């Protein structure tokens, strides 16, 4: 009985975590990996569900099944943050006086496109940076170190073509 409860719990944690990753892949347009993950996700889910459906007179199994689902959501979202698949666009607006930030980022290998803009408080620079998703927060932190008043917007591009992307 204990082994079965542990199995149900871990199966739910695993299948829901896989489901989170699968959904991210679908949104990004990675259909084949999403389909493969989906196969294993539903296989694991069906086995766990079968153990619970066959024992509806044992509420502990249902509680464990639901608890595994809840923890799977939490772990799936943490896993998704850690693997950080894909790319992110970062648009930054800074005061023109902080123009040195552009060259510093380029020296570090970041692909920065920059243009002048006019804001309520004067002349601004708008920086457009596309990079691997796991690097986006680090770039924003570098910018905030130099200009705490920077306005930073993160975007999730679904498709893009051409240009330069920092690889590491």
Swiss-Prot record:
Name of the protein in question: UPF0316 protein Swol_0526
Q: Which family does it belong to?
A: Belongs to the UPF0316 family.
Positions of transmembrane segments: 1-21, 34-54, 59-79
Keyword check for Repeat? no
Keywords of the record, alphabetical order, are: Cell membrane, Membrane, Transmembrane, Transmembrane helix
Q: What is the lineage of its organism?
A: Bacteria, Bacillati, Bacillota, Clostridia, Eubacteriales
Is Kinase one of the keywords? no
Organism name: Syntrophomonas wolfei subsp. wolfei (strain DSM 2245B / Goettingen)
Name the GO cellular-component terms.
plasma membrane
Protein's membrane topology:
Multi-pass membrane protein
Note the superkingdom of the native organism: Bacteria
